[in-house]
Amino acid sequence: MKKMGPIILAVVIAIGTFALKMMGVIGFKTPPLVEGPKIMFYVPLPEAMHDFPFAMEMASGVYGFPVTITVISTWFVMLFLIMVFRWSSKNLEVVPERKQAFFETIYGFLDDLYGQLLGNWKKKYFTYIGTLFLFLLISNIVSFFPIPGFSSENGVFSIAPALRTPTADLNTTVGLALLTTYSFIAASFRTSGFFGFFKGLFEPMPLMFPINLAGEFAKPTNISIRLFGNMFAGMVILGLLYKAAPVLIPAPLHLYFDLFSGVVQSFVFIMLTMVYIQGSIGDAEYLED
């Protein structure tokens, strides 16, 4: 009976929602893409509450700089990761308990994955690539965090998702791609030198310089547009599905577009990052700092 509890609760909520909809107490509102493809409810407010100041603003500014929902979501992801890192590093023991064993398993998996491509160079890039992977993973699935946002417009009280997938914003993916670009160019400078890097652009013959140069510019473009396109496309598709059937049909698809696709795209981004870094390193031996 306990296992049936969540199912019964979900059925009761669905039936109650439809009943309120039929009575005109609440209504469904198709969310704009900038707020995520989730169900939003709107409730008509009494005139006395039309000017009530709701605290949750989707976009504002600080000292002239815009603070959008993407920025807020990115801050949330960074704060969440800092809290997880601090919690996971407390009370470490020689014989690990379940919490410590869980994080050591993740560390071991990433260490083996990086070692296959980077060899001994993984010692230098593990921190960056590991942090990048965890940031991408949480950013891609942040829409699963049940944090509501509230707003009031024209006498209508709206409940919408407070967070948006940061990687569905091109500004985020381009910024991450530029960090990766700096990493593999710095690796090339480290192993081949400044002039060696530019000499490589003329190989195997000088006529290849335009193509090689275009290839270097294509790397950050590739990883940024790939990640942005996949995450934003998922939002568009789910938004269309919510437009057609706002309650039951789109819900299971979040497991694919938000969870499965988010995990896969995180792996794709870091794998391409490691491939680019490995291509810059080549056969050079690991150099200690």
Swiss-Prot record:
Disulfide-linked positions: none
Record-annotated membrane-spanning stretches: 7-27, 65-85, 129-149, 169-189, 231-251, 257-277
This protein's record includes keyword Ion transport: yes
GO BP: proton motive force-driven plasma membrane ATP synthesis; sodium ion transport
Described function: Key component of the proton channel; it plays a direct role in the translocation of protons across the membrane.
Keyword annotations from UniProtKB, A to Z: ATP synthesis, Cell membrane, CF(0), Hydrogen ion transport, Ion transport, Membrane, Sodium, Sodium transport, Transmembrane, Transmembrane helix, Transport
Taxonomy, superkingdom: Bacteria
Membrane-topology descriptor: Multi-pass membrane protein
Subcellular location per the Swiss-Prot or TrEMBL entry: Cell membrane
Gene3D superfamilies from the UniProt entry: ATP synthase, F0 complex, subunit A (1.20.120.220)
InterPro entries given in the database record: ATP_syn_F0_a_bact/chloroplast, ATP_synth_F0_asu, ATP_synth_F0_asu_AS, F0_ATP_A_sf
GO cellular component labels: plasma membrane; proton-transporting ATP synthase complex
Family, similarity comment: Belongs to the ATPase A chain family.
Alphabetized GO MF terms: proton-transporting ATP synthase activity, rotational mechanism
Gene responsible for this protein: atpB
Protein name per UniProt: ATP synthase subunit a, sodium ion specific
